[in-house]
């Protein structure tokens, strides 16, 4: 079997470094390119320098050259560069795995449009455990659909720039969908001052940013006399990276827009 050629965007970032390691660890993949922004101090360095690997792949800012020698790009950067990379992937017929969060509606529309021409796995979280949690939440919300207040609490490291996290928002979307609600209409993001009694139709969000928290997410269903808490805690970014590489192998040869539920076969259950 010919190894799948995978390039990493943001290869010198916290997530990018772990992705380089994950590609190296997978028996069916090989690192074909590593991208960083122009002016990065890492340009020219071996892509594995930060994790003790010698990959033979130099970090570059030449997107066209990197994509020309790749089957898939994995991108966990920020919305603006991800959308630029997306258009290049369409031009080069390269599949793309998108773990970037914080897209606005226009950005999401661009991803949907691009999926008509290439294969895309776009997910708020690539952890197997988190995606199983989404699946569980759908069932729980259907059962606890009356008389329960719903809150989502998430925590991440001090460097995360968007809030709530994409994973927290996806949890909210799953719950709202199960309840027949529109998250845009029922979400409450933070509370301050005299807020009055809680509206029972709302889904609340609370955010923590501190230290080096990799990712903590809890969905709370509370009523008089009891509460149900469904929690996922990540202790290593490798869980996200390994999932992204798994998605890259899965989407090879496909066209269309998928998420991690598709990769894991959970959308068929």
Curated annotation (Swiss-Prot):
Positions of NAD(+) binding: 10-15, 36, 99-101, 123-126
GO annotation terms (biological process): diaminopimelate biosynthetic process; lysine biosynthetic process via diaminopimelate
Keyword tags: Amino-acid biosynthesis, Cytoplasm, Diaminopimelate biosynthesis, Lysine biosynthesis, NAD, NADP, Oxidoreductase
Class of enzymatic activity (EC top level): oxidoreductase
Pfam families named in the record: DapB_C, DapB_N
Residues that bind (S)-2,3,4,5-tetrahydrodipicolinate: 157, 166-167
Positions of the catalytic residues: 156 (proton donor/acceptor), 160 (proton donor)
Record's GO cellular component terms: cytosol
Catalysed reactions listed for this entry: (S)-2,3,4,5-tetrahydrodipicolinate + NAD(+) + H2O = (2S,4S)-4-hydroxy-2,3,4,5-tetrahydrodipicolinate + NADH + H(+); (S)-2,3,4,5-tetrahydrodipicolinate + NADP(+) + H2O = (2S,4S)-4-hydroxy-2,3,4,5-tetrahydrodipicolinate + NADPH + H(+)
Compartments where located: Cytoplasm
Pathway the protein takes part in: Amino-acid biosynthesis; L-lysine biosynthesis via DAP pathway; (S)-tetrahydrodipicolinate from L-aspartate: step 4/4
A single GO molecular function term of this UniProt record: NAD binding
Enzyme Commission number, as recorded: 1.17.1.8
HAMAP family: DapB (MF_00102)
Protein family per UniProt: Belongs to the DapB family.
Record-linked PANTHER family: 4-HYDROXY-TETRAHYDRODIPICOLINATE REDUCTASE 1, CHLOROPLASTIC-RELATED, DIHYDRODIPICOLINATE REDUCTASE
Function noted in UniProt: Catalyzes the conversion of 4-hydroxy-tetrahydrodipicolinate (HTPA) to tetrahydrodipicolinate.
Designated name of the protein: 4-hydroxy-tetrahydrodipicolinate reductase
The organism's taxonomic lineage, starting at the top: Bacteria, Pseudomonadati, Pseudomonadota, Betaproteobacteria, Neisseriales
């Amino acid at each position: 079997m010919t190894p799948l050629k995978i390039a990493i965007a943001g290869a010198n970032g916290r997530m990018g470094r772990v992705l380089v390691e994950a590609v190296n660890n997978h028996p069916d993949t090989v690192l074909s390119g590593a991208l960083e922004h122009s002016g990065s101090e890492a340009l020219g360095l071996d892509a594995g320098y930060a994790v003790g690997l010698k990959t033979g792949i130099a970090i570059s800012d030449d997107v066209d050259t990197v994509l020309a020698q790749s089957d898939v790009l994995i991108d966990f950067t920020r919305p603006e560069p991800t959308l630029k990379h997306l258009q290049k992937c369409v031009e080069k017929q390269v599949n793309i795995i998108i773990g970037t969060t914080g897209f606005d509606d226009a950005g999401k529309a661009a991803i949907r449009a691009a999926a008509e021409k290439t294969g895309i796995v776009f997910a708020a979280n690539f952890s197997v455990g988190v995606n199983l949690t989404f699946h569980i939440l759908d069932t729980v919300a259907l059962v606890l659909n009356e008389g329960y207040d719903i809150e989502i609490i998430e925590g991440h490291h001090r460097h995360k720039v968007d809030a709530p996290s994409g994973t927290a928002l996806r949890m909210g979307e799953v719950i709202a969908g199960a309840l027949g609600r529109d998250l845009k209409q029922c979400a409450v993001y933070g509370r301050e001052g005299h807020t009055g009694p809680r509206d029972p139709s709302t889904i609340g969000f609370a955010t923590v940013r501190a230290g080096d928290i990799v990712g903590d997410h809890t969905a709370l269903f509370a009523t008089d006399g009891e509460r149900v808490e469904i929690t996922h805690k990540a202790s290593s970014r490798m869980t996200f990276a390994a999932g992204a590489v798994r998605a890259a192998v899965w989407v090879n040869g496909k066209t269309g827009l998928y998420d991690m539920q598709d990769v894991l076969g959970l959308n068929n259950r």
